[in-house]
């Protein structure tokens, strides 16, 4: 453990590890914003197959995110915004629940096959 503190993780310095983590995190955030949100959920941009596949693969690799599930939950959120049927409404479910139990809220939403079939149309089957 002392060697890691002195030599860094696999021989990389702390600043190199931090830089790597920042770059990987940024690519993941851009992938969610561009691919899942703009391209898949709202269809507000067009992406070529190569870049779409890159984003899809990156999200699978870094988050395990399934495109159809994320898209369906997001579309339902817009369709049922701030109602009892909104899958992640901080107004109806409370902000602390969404912030601290967001994964459980999301898993509950994707467990509903009707949500996936109704709002996940046009998405790839990951």
Enumerate the language-model features and the residues they cover.
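Non-catalytic, topology-defining segments of multipass membrane proteins
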Residues: 1-126
């Amino acid at each position: 453990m002392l060697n890691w503190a002195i030599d860094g993780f696999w021989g990389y310095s702390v600043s190199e590890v931090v830089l790597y983590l920042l770059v990987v995190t940024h690519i993941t955030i851009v992938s969610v914003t561009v691919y899942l949100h703009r391209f898949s959920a709202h269809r507000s941009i067009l992406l070529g197959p190569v870049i779409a596949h890159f984003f899809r693969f990156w999200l699978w690799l870094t988050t395990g995110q399934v495109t159809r599930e994320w898209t369906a939950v997001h579309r339902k959120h817009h369709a049922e915004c701030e109602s009892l049927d909104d899958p992640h409404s901080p107004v109806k479910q409370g902000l602390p629940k969404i912030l601290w139990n967001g994964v459980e809220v999301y898993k509950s939403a994707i467990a509903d096959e009707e949500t996936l079939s109704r709002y996940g149309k046009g998405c790839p089957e990951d």
